[in-house]
């Protein structure tokens, strides 16, 4: 899976319309809807860098280079994980106070790599922020970026009493 930079189609822009980093995905659930579409749940499994596109077939296909998963400096990553774990619990609590989520803070993983992906997947952030996290070279850099994002989001939740809004640009039009 790889995100399109803008809109729903790559159009004539090809590789320029796509983000450079994506991830392989495992299908967890596919539920048919009455209108013929499917509600699909996937889990990202391994990051990759898009190397080339092949548009000679009916569906656009890409050639990718799989990326290794690094922790970064072990001691610094462990410290960053402690800070992010606390910040993420505070974030979930603040969302709960605003009625956005009723999920209590789960038992968070101790492994910095796993924690970094759990936090990235769970935060209510826009595609640009989510893509930036995916593109970080290792868990330490991802956790450092998450610490900044958690601080920003907590400040907005506490100061502005604002709740994150979903990205409506890619949603079907509704007059409601």
Language model: regions and residue ranges:
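N-terminal low-complexity, acidic/polar interaction/targeting segments
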Residues: 1-176
